Amino acid sequence: MHVPLHLAALGLLLVAGAAAAEPEIRPLRIEVGFEGSCPHSPQGVKQEGPAVFRLFPSWRASPGISEESVGRSTRLGFKVINEGRAAEPIEVLIDWQYDEAPPKDRPNFSSRAEYMSYRDFVVVRGPLDASWRTTMLDIEGSVGRLRIQVPAGATEIHWHPPYTFTDCERFVDRVARDPRVRVEVIGQSEEGRPIRMLKITDHSGRPKKAALIRARVHAYESAGSYAVEGMVRWLVSDDAYALAAVHEYAFHVIPMANPDGVFNGLGRLTAPRGADLTFVGSRPDRLHDVMKQTADRLRPALFVDLHNWQSKQIDGLLGLNVDVRERFTRFMPDQVQFGKQWFIRDPYPTVARPPNEETLGAYCRRCYGTVAVGFEFPWFGRTVDDVRATGRTTLWALLRAMETPPAVGKSR
């Protein structure tokens, strides 16, 4: 059958018009639910357009307390999956829900603006990237707006560079090959994950002072994990000061104190209504017993707790004896290369009877005369390698500060 040319052309135009009228489908989706992700499930993600998504970092399967409650989250981690072949633009609205926090759990900040000033950036790593890159956000109320191009494949986005429970297990397995390292399982979490402790010392028969170092008490504080990696790598190196350190001390390192919180993408606690392991026995949790029993067994001469708080410009030097602290800051002054200066809080007076709420460091100081210190190393302006190097420098400087200073005029 012969179709007139003008009718055939009209048919092509109609087909083309129908195709043009079909909505554009972009091959983008948000993936959560992996180890350490936050939100924890797709219920914390809302799609608002073909390439526009809203995320709720405070979403929990069950109501939480402290930094696990609505408007208090300190964790963020998700993936953007581009199933196409070309890079695609995406807009992600990260809704921290500051104004929805219950009054008893309202963030301890002067204003929403201060709270969001710590949440105006994320770190991004594409499928071909070797390292994390910082990306700044536009802030509107308590929402951070991220606009980026994502290549084909999976692009991972977090508030801070992540460090998972699996990462820690692999690190422990690697360093355990060193003859100076022995690994001990000191307990299990409520969900059955092992709490592993490294003992690092040389094989001389001399008596050793015990040093206890721990990281990841608070689940979101991944800088503690990278700092402890830097410390451990230094202790098993051939550096002269490291060799002297393991000759004098037996270092006991707990690199992952809160594995359930880290694995499940929490902020501060061991569970949505769980324990804060900073303190001795804040709530019923078997990890409280593990930490206290370990401290009682070791009676450490030195205790180090590694954290990273949210402040961008301030490193924390907390609870160190004044004489040791003064020497420490000579060996490790303000880290101006990262735009940081020390906030110093001297130890609280030791009391004979325990207070209602006592940190593990204060407990060790009160019971065993331990030199105890907490460090806070915020991420902003630092890379993963920077934090590892900061950990190494911190331990070196602290051990130098612990030494008896030479008498004036006695040097040779």
Could you say what each language-model-derived stretch is?
Residues 6-16:
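Bacterial N-terminal signal peptides
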Residues 22-151:
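Extreme N-terminal flexible tails
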Residues 182-201, 205-345, 365, 370-379:
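Active-site/substrate-binding loop(s) of hydrolase catalytic cores
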Residues 1-3:
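N-terminal secretory signal peptides that target proteins for export/translocation
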Residues 139-179:
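Extended acidic/polar, glycine-enriched regions
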Residues 162, 317-318, 353-412:
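Active-site-adjacent mobile loop/cap segments within catalytic or ligand-binding domains
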Residues 14-24:
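Bacterial Sec-dependent signal peptides at the C-terminal "C-region" and cleavage site
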Residues 106-113, 165-184, 233:
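Glycine/proline-rich low-complexity spacer/linker segments in large multi-domain proteins
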